[in-house]
Structure formats: C-alpha cells, structure tokens
Amino acid sequence: MQHGCRFLHAPVLGSTAQAADGSLLLFVGGNEEAFHRVEYILQTLGKKIWYFPSLEQAAIMKLMCNSMIAGLIASLVQALVLGKKAGIDPRTFLEVLSFSQLNAPTLQLKGTAIIERNFSPRFFVEHLLKDITLLVEAAASLGVPVPVIEEIQKLFIEAKNSGWEKEDYCAVVKVLEQKAGIEVR
C-alpha cells in the first residue's frame, strides 16, 4: 500500500449482453476498506457482488464457476452427439431436459445454438480454455486433483487446434461430431 494506493481485483461472470445491461456477477478481492469505498460504483456493473479478502479467492471463484460452465457444455455436447448418432432428435433431448431437474438456462441456450449451427461468440473457446487452464494450474498449486476438468481441457485444446478458438465455446461440439461422423442439427 505504498503511496496510499489500494488495489482490488474484480473478475466477473456473465456474457457481453449481461455486461451491457449491468447484470454481471462480480467477485471482488482485495482491501475491504477500498471495496466499501467503491462498492456503489461496482453495483452499476452487476446484479450481485461477493467480497473476498484476497485477490486469489476472487480469481478462483470465477475459475470455479467457469469450470462448471465447461463441465455443463462438455456433458451437453457429449449427450447431443450420442443422441444424434442413436437417431434421437436433439430438440427432443432439450425438451426432456426442460422438464427435468437437469434443466439449466445454459443448456437450453447452447443446445439451441448447436442445433441451429450458431457459433457466434458470446464467450470464445479460447477464453474458456484459458480459464480452464488457470483453474488446473491453481488446483495443482493447492494440491487439489481435478481429473474431470483436465479431461475437459483436452476437448477445448482440440477445438482450439482445429481452428475454432474464436467461436462460441459450444463449438467444442464439432470435435465430437467429427469423431462420430455426424452433425447435430
């Protein structure tokens, strides 16, 4: 805190649309006094703010959330490709999800985007891969095994290496589609 400066780190969760309408989720880490001084400004950016005493805790919370998103999309694309190969209409699968405890807005949004072949980015493959990689590194530094996200990381690396890094993260479906010899529509 040389020269009286205080530093905050505020990773966010949400898309560009949520940034535009001020409904991001913010994870703020750092000096508590500084946080309270600028909290009213941060409230204009998001619908909910969580304060963490350390910068690292705020960063890891964001990475934890994005690892859940990666897990959801990996499960979704796997199910859609398997279902398509078995002759199941992907829209029927999304409808079944909508009536179950498994339903989540992300699954419906990304499932529909996949079926409609709309990979316009809301969050790039390469950006989610970066967060997955940071989570794997953070977990290793803390001595926490994360075998599931390490496998998901491989899927995202394949998508990036195939040239889809600037597409929406649901474009990872193309990796499994190529291997299965089908396209989810």
Specify the residue positions occupied by each region the protein language model found.
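Rossmann-fold dinucleotide-binding core
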Residues: 1-67
